[in-house]
Design a protein with these regions (language model features):
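Conserved acetyl-CoA-binding loop-helix of GNAT-fold acetyltransferases
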Residues: 1, 158, 164-181, 200, ...
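Short, cationic low-complexity segments
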Residues: 59-84
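Conserved GNAT acetyl-CoA-binding A-motif
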Residues: 2-12, 179-191
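Conserved catalytic-core motifs of GNAT/GCN5-like acyltransferases
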Residues: 9-11, 26-42, 208-223
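A conserved beta-strand-loop-helix scaffold within acyl/acetyltransferase catalytic domains
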Residues: 97-160
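A short beta-loop-alpha structural element at the N-terminal edge
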Residues: 81-95
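Conserved active-site tyrosine of GNAT-family acetyltransferases
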Residues: 16-21, 25, 201-203
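Short, charged, solvent-exposed linker or helix-capping segments at domain edges/interfaces
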Residues: 52-62, 238-239
Length: 239
């Protein structure tokens, strides 16, 4: 009440759902087998303003039309002119250059060298990139919960002149393969509703849509609705 927030958001284990339901929270999305490949997680919300609950209907319509179509799962090889790898502390300055050209604002301080350096050193986040002639042109990251064996696939940024080459798909596939080696069991993302290309990337990569967080995240200068996608992994199947 002190800051006049119009939405309260919580990501909690389904074990605690009754407490939140009793306090007036509603489910906006859910991911099964989120914790160690066993316990589900719920994305809950409590609104203080009816206006905050109104989604961007135009973007919703475009997104739903995408879901009607069968996903395209054709795998493409990365062109020999480009290379993909895991990034290190030595790449931080180049990462910031890419992020600043893609995002006006961001929910986390990805423009700050110290934030990126510490997240890499503490093994909280793994960063990946695509380079051309030694220059970093695309970045993504996996925010890893090593104890619970899940990872958020996020921070996808491709320099404008290199878009249209499915770099996000290549980065996503590379991240999945690297994390699978470390026994991660659930991958997920929270993607901007209005970014049809990113939603299509996860749809075509076998992720399942599980809900939309209405006007949830401050990004690129606005508070936007976000779609939740997930993929459960096991040694034998992908769900």
């Amino acid at each position: 009440h002190e800051f006049s927030y119009t939405k309260i958001f919580a990501k909690v284990s389904s074990l605690f759902a009754p407490l939140f339901f009793n306090a007036g929270y509603i489910i906006e999305a859910a991911i099964p087998r989120f914790f160690k490949g066993e316990q589900d997680v719920l994305f809950l919300a409590k609104y203080k303003s009816s206006e905050r609950q109104i989604p961007e209907y135009d973007s919703f319509e475009v997104f739903q039309n995408m879901l009607v179509n069968v996903p395209s799962v054709n795998k493409m090889q990365l062109d020999n002119d480009f290379s993909i790898r895991k990034l290190t502390i030595d790449d931080v300055s180049s990462m910031i250059v890419v992020f600043k050209q893609v995002f006006e604002t961001y929910p986390f301080p990805i423009f700050e060298p110290l934030f990126l350096t510490e997240s890499i050193q503490e093994n909280k986040t793994q960063y990946f990139g695509i380079s051309c002639e030694g220059n970093l042109i695309a970045v993504s990251s996996a925010e890893c919960d090593n104890a619970e064996q899940n990872a958020e696939m996020t921070d996808f940024a491709v320099l404008p002149r290199y878009r249209g080459k499915r770099f996000a798909s290549h980065l996503l596939s590379y991240m999945e393969n690297e994390l699978f080696k470390s026994n991660f069991k659930t991958f997920y993302t929270i993607s901007r509703l209005k970014s049809l290309s990113m939603n299509r990337t996860f749809y075509n990569s076998g992720y399942k849509y599980s809900g939309t967080l209405i006007k949830n995240t401050q990004i690129s200068g606005n508070i936007e609705s976000m779609n939740v996608w997930y993929k459960n992994i096991s040694t034998n199947t992908q769900e």
